[in-house]
């Protein structure tokens, strides 16, 4: 008979965690889905670039606002209830978006999706901290990013093929149905702690459950903000995530189609290559950081490589297609270094605040695309020359460069801020 003195086998830990990660996959799918249906959405709702940027960013508006509450709820409710509720509301939001008669309802659907899937990543980090030994945390965090990017890849060329074949509304309806099934799976399979399955917990579960007092909630927020690494790691990852998700999640496909003369499906494939490389880079950078016992040097190397890559991709003209593809892969891979932020921040505060600090950091991570997607859209409209193609606005190279400059500035400033972080040497603050 299994005793509580034995920790759960890794196979069970991966299974429990995997159901939560599947929800994160679907959340990432919804996050970047507008990138391959920009023309359909602009035509359906009569949108300019600013309005399209806002439609995509409505996901991020609610996503960002939910990050600190999500971190707190992960500590208080536990990941099972949190992920189940999130998956249910995300399915409702996808249904609303797919059936939207006007742009208002499309905005509302995207807003609901973003707020609902906001729980996915932090919930998965909570599962990782409870079901795996501490030495696995950065690698499992990177694996979560991998799952997310798999969702983004499905939202590339495969989604484009489905949109062409069945229309964007029917395709989004199908995604809502899949999300309802994920909701059911999480509720049936996932458990908060190994102790609920008869195994020994890796953490002091009683201490991490806490209570629902208002004083505890606000004290947790105030406490994590006392540590300088929290502030720095709030800002730093948003620079690269803003580049990846503003380009790969919205403006990359129309840019590559217009200025590299690629068919939409090929542009979507290059976009997917960027995101796949990002997915692969996350667990590799996280695992390498764990292996050498340092956070800062690996993070700095990856960040520097990514900034150089984005500078070339966005501002050097007439790149051969094979070189452009190689640069997108290298830059996406290097951008995976941002996953180190979560282990870095977790080690910088007391262990009982892990959920709260990861919520704060994830809020900073997603603030990049939240601000940059509509900002780049605004710059595109500001520099628009009046060109139209089948009733949809077309933007010239100068307009794209003006918008993309915003992305690069944030990334460069974040690279500078990385110098000021305090190394944890992969050791949890006691």
Language model region names:
Residues 2-9, 193-234:
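Juxtamembrane intracellular "pre-TM" segments in multi-pass secondary transporters
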Residues 34-36, 227-285, 369-377:
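Extracytoplasmic gate region of multi-pass secondary transporters
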Residues 46, 78, 99-105, 133, ...:
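Helix-breaking motifs and short loop linkers at transmembrane-helix boundaries and internal kinks
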Residues 65-104:
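Conserved MFS/SLC helix-loop-helix module at the cytosolic interface between two early adjacent transmembrane helices
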Residues 76-87, 290-304:
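Cytoplasmic membrane-interface "Motif A"-like loop-to-helix N-cap segments
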Residues 88-101, 304-318:
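C-terminal ends and interior cores of transmembrane alpha-helices
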Residues 109-148:
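Cytoplasmic helix-loop-helix junction between adjacent transmembrane helices
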Residues 144-195:
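Helix-loop-helix hairpin linking two adjacent transmembrane segments in secondary transporters
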């Amino acid at each position: 008979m299994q005793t509580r003195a034995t920790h759960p086998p890794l196979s069970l830990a991966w299974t429990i965690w995997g159901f939560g990660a599947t929800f994160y996959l679907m959340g990432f799918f919804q996050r970047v889905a507008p990138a391959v249906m920009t023309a359909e959405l602009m035509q359906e709702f009569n949108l300019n670039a600013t309005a399209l940027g806002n439609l995509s960013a409505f996901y991020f508006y609610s996503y960002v606002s939910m990050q600190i509450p999500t971190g707190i709820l992960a500590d208080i409710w536990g990941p099972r209830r949190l992920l189940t509720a999130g998956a249910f509301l995300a399915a409702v939001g996808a249904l609303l978006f797919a059936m939207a008669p006007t742009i208002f309802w499309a905005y509302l659907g995207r807003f609901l999706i973003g707020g609902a899937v906001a729980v996915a990543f932090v919930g998965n980090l909570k599962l990782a901290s409870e079901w795996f030994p501490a030495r696995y945390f950065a690698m499992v965090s990177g694996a979560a990013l991998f799952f997310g990017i798999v969702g983004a890849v499905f939202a590339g060329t495969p989604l484009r093929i489905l949109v062409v074949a069945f229309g964007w509304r029917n395709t989004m309806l199908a995604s809502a149905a899949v999300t309802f099934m994920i909701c059911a799976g999480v509720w049936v399979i996932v458990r908060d702690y190994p102790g609920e399955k008869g195994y020994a917990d890796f953490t002091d579960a009683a201490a991490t459950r806490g209570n629902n007092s208002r004083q505890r909630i606000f004290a947790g927020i105030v406490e994590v903000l006392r540590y300088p690494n929290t502030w720095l790691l709030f800002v730093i990852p948003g620079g690269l995530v803003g580049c990846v998700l503003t380009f790969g999640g919205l403006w990359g496909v129309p840019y590559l189609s217009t200025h590299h003369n690629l068919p939409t499906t090929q542009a979507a494939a290059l976009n997917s290559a960027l995101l796949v490389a990002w997915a692969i880079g996350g667990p590799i950078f996280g695992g390498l950081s764990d292996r050498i016992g340092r956070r800062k040097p690996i993070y700095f190397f990856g960040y520097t490589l990514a900034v150089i890559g984005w500078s070339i991709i966005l501002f050097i003209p007439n790149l051969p297609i094979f070189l452009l593809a190689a640069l997108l892969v290298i830059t996406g891979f290097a951008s995976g270094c941002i996953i180190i932020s979560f282990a870095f921040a977790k080690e910088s505060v007391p262990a009982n605040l892990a959920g709260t600090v990861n919520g704060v950091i994830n809020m900073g991570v997603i603030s990049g695309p939240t601000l940059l997607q509509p900002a780049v859209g605004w710059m595109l409209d500001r520099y628009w020359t009046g060109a139209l193609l089948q009733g949809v606005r077309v933007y010239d190279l100068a307009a794209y460069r003006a918008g993309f400059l915003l992305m690069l500035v944030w990334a460069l400033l974040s690279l500078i801020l990385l110098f000021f972080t305090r190394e944890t040497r992969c050791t949890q603050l006691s």
